[in-house]
């Protein structure tokens, strides 16, 4: 009789044990899914942080690039060691030393002058600014580059200064115009500017190609105003 009374309890225990065994994999699966969900959320947060960091770095890089052309003659080579030297014995070019260059359709009210008297890059920019209220010329298309080249081919020099110069720091160096206009055109000689030396840009009187040159070199120059 006692065995018969104990039998239902034994059966109940066996069934409960089977239920626990069947539920165990389901619980483990739920825990695994929860862990995977946490890992996925963590991965998404890391991706967002990384993307934000890259955006910040890129934005800072663009700011550095923009500021490079906003600074005036930050490159030591382009700047005279003593700014007062620019004022020493300063004289504007004589009439016989200048030649008017045909204007550009891009700016119908602008004037352009070829100054035959050789100057360093900084001295030439100083003359353009103080004598004519302008800058060394900026060139934005092939046709105007050709006009400049045709006019300068009459001078007894291989090159003339135009308003391009290299500014910035390390990887953020870039070519800029002294008048602050956008650098949207270039006509480099083969191998230039990568194999060139110097931080200033000169136009070759034969062919009209551009070359990098040492800024303290004395050359004729073209002003725009």
Swiss-Prot record:
Record-annotated membrane-spanning stretches: none
Gene Ontology biological-process annotations: basophil activation; histamine biosynthetic process; immune response; leukotriene biosynthetic process; negative regulation of translation; neutrophil activation; positive regulation of interleukin-8 production; superoxide anion generation
Gene Ontology CC terms, in alphabetical order: collagen-containing extracellular matrix; extracellular region; specific granule lumen; tertiary granule lumen
Location in the cell: Cytoplasmic granule
Tissue spec. comment: Expressed in bone marrow. Not detected in placenta.
Keywords linked to the UniProt accession: Disulfide bond, Lectin, Signal
Residue span(s) of domain C-type lectin: 107-224
Any Pfam family matching the protein: Lectin_C
CDD domains according to UniProt: CLECT_EMBP_like (cd03598)
Intrachain S-S bonds: 128-223, 200-215
Residues spanning the signal sequence: 1-17
Molecular function terms from GO: carbohydrate binding; extracellular matrix structural constituent conferring compression resistance
PANTHER family: MANNOSE, PHOSPHOLIPASE, LECTIN RECEPTOR RELATED (PTHR22803)
Function recorded in the entry: Possesses similar cytotoxic and cytostimulatory activities to PRG2/MBP. In vitro, stimulates neutrophil superoxide production and IL8 release, and histamine and leukotriene C4 release from basophils.
Protein name, as recorded: Proteoglycan 3
Organism in which the protein naturally occurs: Homo sapiens
UniProt gene name: PRG3
